[in-house]
A protein has these predicted regions:
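Conserved, mostly hydrophobic/aromatic
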Residues: 1, 68, 111, 151, ...
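Active-site-proximal beta-alpha core segment in soluble small-molecule metabolic enzymes
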Residues: 1-148
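Glycine-rich nucleotide phosphate-binding loop and flanking beta-alpha elements
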Residues: 26, 53, 74, 157, ...
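Anionic group-transfer/hydrolysis microenvironments
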Residues: 50, 71-73, 114, 152, ...
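Glycine-rich beta-strand-to-loop/alpha-helix junction loops that act as flexible
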Residues: 115-116, 149-159, 194-199
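Short glycine/threonine-rich loop-to-helix capping motif typified by GTGT followed
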Residues: 120-127, 158-170, 201-213
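A compositional/structural signature marking long, glycine- and acidic/polar-rich segments
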Residues: 133-141, 148-154, 162-176, 191
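Charged (often Lys/Glu-rich) extended helix/loop segments that serve as interaction or gating elements
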Residues: 173-175, 179-183, 187-302
Length: 302
């Protein structure tokens, strides 16, 4: 609906490139088919499972492009071994040979590679990238029309003032590894697409709060109460222990004290503290007569 609406407003033509990710309901598949049947030829639905191609075949009456999402292996610390999304590494080549190679209309154009932990300079990440490249090289040799690799998972965003991540190094290293692997395999390098959701929009948002009271529960713990709830306005802080840049907005020259931050709800999890995160929280000393405001930054992703 958004694609159609923007087209009708003249924002782009029917040559716009659209990648359709995720598990697709019948309604989602029907709307993808409608776009392709109405002349949008650069729509690429990324197959999450075998059923999706069958449904698209039933409803599209012309040639169309598709991609396949690789079901990557998760980090050892995860509660499951393989991503719930996509098709397994070992199943992609047989699936292509049996269902796509002789398909009258579908053309495989893209492999989608997504790592939940994001792009990190770790053995786990490089190992998963190499497995993806092996699939790409094998596919390219039997399916020349495959020409694109969509890298998901994305770059991290700055979550603390001492954040240190060498973006340029990682970009250069990823491109270098892809180029080197393709040269060794004797296949053409793919067009590289990226999906960096948090990195793209993370810095677009911030949350501002007022400290409305301080509670001393014992000799060591001081609770600064905000005029809102972390559970409702910043749910990532308690749900997945997300850390954000947090700074006082005023009284920077005052004396500081170590505190815990609590939300207004009666839920015991409605807090943001130094035990849960990497840095202790220090704020200007609470005063009933001097208002204190704080801000959480780079919260625009979710």
């Amino acid at each position: 609906d958004i694609i159609k609406s923007l087209y009708e407003k003249g924002k782009y033509g029917k040559d716009v490139e659209v990648i359709c990710n995720g598990f697709k309901t019948d309604d989602y598949l029907a709307k993808i088919s409608d776009l392709i049947n109405s002349g949008f030829q650069n729509i690429i639905p990324i197959l999450d499972n075998y059923r999706e191609l069958d449904k698209l075949t039933e409803s599209i009456d012309s040639t169309f492009n598709i991609g396949i999402r690789i079901a990557s292996e998760e980090e050892p610390k995860f509660e499951f071994y393989t991503s719930r999304l996509g098709i397994g590494y070992k199943d992609i080549i047989p699936y292509y040979s049996q269902k796509i190679a002789e398909h009258p209309n579908a053309r495989l154009k893209m492999l989608h590679f997504f790592i939940n932990t994001g792009i990190k300079d770790t053995a786990y990440y490089w190992n998963e990238l190499y497995k993806c490249l092996r699939v790409y090289a094998r596919l390219k040799k039997i399916a020349p029309e495959v020409d694109s690799l969509n890298i998901g998972g994305g770059f991290p965003i700055k979550t603390s003032l001492n954040f240190d991540y060498d973006y340029q190094y990682m970009v250069n290293e990823i491109v270098s590894q892809i180029k080197k692997f393709c040269e060794e395999e004797g296949v053409e390098e793919p067009n590289i697409y990226t999906e960096f959701g948090s990195f793209t929009v993370g810095e677009s948002g911030g949350h501002l709060y007022k400290i409305i009271s301080q509670k001393r529960q014992n000799d060591r713990e001081k609770w600064n109460m905000i005029d809102s709830s972390f559970m409702t306005t910043l749910p990532d802080t308690w749900a997945i222990s997300r850390h954000f840049i947090m700074l006082p907005l005023n009284r920077w020259e005052d004396t500081y004290e170590r505190v815990f931050l609590g939300g207004l709800t009666c839920d015991s999890d409605d807090y943001y503290n130094s035990e849960q995160h990497t840095n202790a929280i220090y704020l200007p000393v609470f005063s009933d007569t001097k208002p204190l405001y704080i801000g959480f930054f780079h919260t625009g992703a979710y």
